[in-house]
Amino acid sequence: MSTLKSVTIVHPSSAVNNIVNDASGNVAVGNNLTVAGSSTITGNETVTGTLTVGGAAVVAVAPTTAGNVPFSTNGTTWSSTAKIVQGTAVASTSGTSIDFTGIPSWVKRVTVMFNGVSTSGTSPKLIQLGSGSVTSTGYISAGGIISGSTGFNVASSTAGFIINSIEGADNIYGSAILNLVTGNTWGACGTLGDVTGTYVNAYTVSGGVTLSGALDRVRITTVNGTDTFDAGTINIMYE
């Protein structure tokens, strides 16, 4: 077997060195490298340009936080993003409404979480969505209550997704899930409950609404718009 020993291999018409070998066994290719057959790599590879596999450019993104995944909103720019993004919890202890804004346009699901939420009166709670501003019309919504004291009752609303909490001193726990159906149309479903004195109440949430654009905000308020929040915490998660 013959051995070819050379530091540099250059094509007669090439202006650059095609292949450069060093004493450690490393090989540098001056320009493009095409492999027609199979290639096995047992060491580490560093790619400083674009790597194309099967005609598609491959981009490597290393998540910067445990539990994150590489994510792109346009297929070109990638970032380290949490699989489920948790909002900042808000104490529902004052005011007539609680807003969560800045929801990204790529979001397909939002979970609204209630932890001991109460208001000053008996007006049912509402979850309203928005794009640029809060939408307060056009909802098809039904909310049921199974009450330990008054039995079963159902209410509807066109102003938001209704939580039919019609008894005083309700401290509501549970969640409502908002799902993107198609375009800017969202559907809602949820199950919540509370214990009021010696009675136990359960609530259902359902409905749909079409927004004018991409969802970017969620508001929690009441049907009459005047009852104030006086206990609990509300937060959202989106994905």
Each language-model region and where it sits:
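Intrinsic low-complexity, repeat-rich intrinsically disordered segments enriched
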Residues: 1-80
